[in-house]
């Protein structure tokens, strides 16, 4: 069974490929697997720099988090 980090990483891939809906769904699964949103956010924040390097716009990050 996939772990929370697996769902998060899959969400990152979907997002960088432009599939926002799939990314949000995968991030939602990561939150559920983590058991709470705060733990998800801690993990997500650690990956922000990598997301920016992959072409995600800094202004889009809070928008994505609002979708969750």
Can you describe what each PLM-predicted range is?
Residues 34-68:
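Terminal, low-structured helical/coil segments at or just beyond the last alpha-helical repeat
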């Amino acid at each position: 069974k996939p772990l929370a980090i697996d769902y998060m990483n899959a969400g990152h891939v979907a997002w960088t490929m432009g599939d926002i809906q799939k990314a949000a769904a995968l991030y939602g699964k990561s939150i559920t697997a983590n058991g709470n949103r705060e733990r998800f956010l801690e993990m997500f924040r650690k990956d922000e720099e990598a997301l920016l390097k992959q072409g995600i716009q800094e202004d889009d990050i809070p928008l994505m988090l609002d979708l969750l």
